């Protein structure tokens, strides 16, 4: 069941759902709006190959802390960014992340993203650029997070490798299963 603004406010007031900072316009009719943080990472324009079975992406990412000048997402470029808000999910809520339609109308796109029950941290999001350069700014509301209640609290809440992440978090490889297809 998707939570209404009323249900979301109850979760927040009972401190079952943490959103920090929480703005007056965060809670919407059927979800919450989240803002761009000030960190953006883009892939270096090199011909090096990232081997997903053993390489991290630290050597191929260029990361920036952006202030009032904004950040330009180039045509068809894949960019990692983060939410300003730190969130903590209870064991009976999951989040479905959507790009706000204003940014989709500029041609930006995000892949389907699910926030697991029990997750804590800033949300790292991949943005895919439009056919034209698009400039975005820290603090702009860019995501709409739909909250859904599970039929019961999950047996094993999220405790994975991205738990507690702050800012943009590049992919983390689990080398123990990297070549097991």
Curated annotation (Swiss-Prot):
One of its GO terms (biological process) is dUMP biosynthetic process. SUPFAM superfamilies: dUTPase-like. Pathway: Pyrimidine metabolism; dUMP biosynthesis; dUMP from dCTP (dUTP route): step 1/2. Keywords: Hydrolase, Nucleotide metabolism, Nucleotide-binding. It catalyses: dCTP + H2O + H(+) = dUTP + NH4(+). DCTP binds at residues 100-105, 116, 158, 165. Residues 160-181 are annotated as: Disordered. The active site is at 126 (proton donor/acceptor). CDD domains: trimeric_dUTPase. It comes from the Archaea. One of its GO terms (molecular function) is dCTP deaminase activity. InterPro entries: dCTP_deaminase (IPR011962), dUTPase-like_sf (IPR036157), dUTPase_trimeric (IPR033704). Gene3D superfamilies: 2.70.40.10. The keyword Nucleotide-binding applies. Its EC number is 3.5.4.13. It holds the Pfam family DCD. Belongs to the dCTP deaminase family. Homotrimer. Catalyzes the deamination of dCTP to dUTP. This is dCTP deaminase. It comes from Desulfurococcus amylolyticus (strain DSM 18924 / JCM 16383 / VKM B-2413 / 1221n) (Desulfurococcus kamchatkensis). The gene is dcd.
């Amino acid at each position: 069941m998707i939570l209404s603004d009323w249900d979301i406010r109850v979760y927040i007031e009972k401190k079952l759902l943490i959103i920090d900072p929480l703005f007056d316009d965060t809670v919407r009719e059927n979800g919450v709006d989240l803002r761009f943080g000030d960190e953006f990472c883009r892939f270096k324009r090199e011909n090096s190959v990232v081997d997903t079975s053993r390489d991290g992406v630290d050597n191929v990412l260029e990361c920036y802390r952006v202030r009032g000048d904004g950040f330009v997402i180039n045509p068809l470029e894949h960019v990692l960014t983060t939410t300003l808000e730190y969130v903590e999910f209870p064991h009976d809520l999951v989040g479905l992340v959507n790009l706000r339609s204003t940014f989709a109308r500029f041609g930006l796109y995000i892949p389907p993203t699910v926030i697991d029950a029990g997750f804590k941290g800033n949300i790292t999001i991949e943005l895919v650029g439009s056919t034209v350069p698009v400039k975005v700014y820290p603090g702009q509301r860019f995501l709409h997070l739909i909250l859904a209640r599970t039929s019961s609290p999950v047996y094993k809440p999220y405790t994975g490798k991205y738990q507690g992440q702050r800012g943009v978090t590049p992919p983390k490889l689990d080398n123990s299963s990297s070549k097991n297809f």
